[in-house]
């Protein structure tokens, strides 16, 4: 809908709730007796969060930065026009990393690499009703069960 009507997007939680941290940052946290801030869930990264963090760190290194945060924001901003991620932070360094993302342009290869790390779950309701047929050129399962429609 946003693409169709030319609307902007303001995604939240693009940094995984602070759970996307490099190995170095996690070691530093452990050394200082800090876990990951969390209202619910474990104070350690899940396997998926570790994989994502490692991939973000690899791309960050290619851009000459240690900030997985900047890469995560740059990735989300690269996915569509007019994307304005909601970001936060508790420290000046967080703000600087958020700003750094504005100067990072990911290559198509880097985007493809990041997307290959774990399968993306679009979540409800899109996983129920399907993607925009004007883009995919195919009907969702729900639509296909009710009528034959051409999206050409």
UniProtKB/Swiss-Prot annotation:
A Pfam family reported for this protein in Swiss-Prot or TrEMBL: Aldo_ket_red
Protein name according to UniProt: Putative aryl-alcohol dehydrogenase YFL057C
SUPFAM superfamilies named in the record: NAD(P)-linked oxidoreductase
Similarity field: Belongs to the aldo/keto reductase family. Aldo/keto reductase 2 subfamily.
Enzyme Commission code(s) on record: 1.1.1.-
Job of this protein: Putative aryl-alcohol dehydrogenase.
Keywords, ordered alphabetically: Oxidoreductase
Species, as recorded: Saccharomyces cerevisiae (strain ATCC 204508 / S288c) (Baker's yeast)
A GO term, aspect molecular function: oxidoreductase activity
């Amino acid at each position: 809908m946003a693409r169709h009507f030319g609307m902007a997007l303001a995604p939240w939680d693009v940094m995984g709730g602070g759970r996307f941290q490099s190995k170095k940052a996690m070691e530093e946290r452990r050394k200082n007796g800090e876990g990951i801030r969390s209202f619910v869930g474990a104070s350690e990264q899940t396997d998926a969060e570790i994989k994502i963090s490692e991939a973000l760190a690899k791309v960050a290194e290619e851009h000459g930065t240690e900030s997985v945060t900047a890469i995560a924001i740059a990735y989300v901003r690269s996915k569509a026009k007019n994307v304005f991620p909601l970001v936060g932070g508790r420290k000046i360094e967080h703000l600087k990393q958020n700003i750094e993302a504005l100067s990072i342009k990911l290559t198509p290869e880097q985007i493809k690499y990041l997307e290959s790390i774990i399968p993306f779950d679009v979540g409800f309701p899109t996983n129920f009703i399907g993607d925009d047929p004007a883009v995919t050129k195919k009907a969702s399962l729900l639509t296909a069960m009710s009528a034959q429609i051409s999206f050409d």
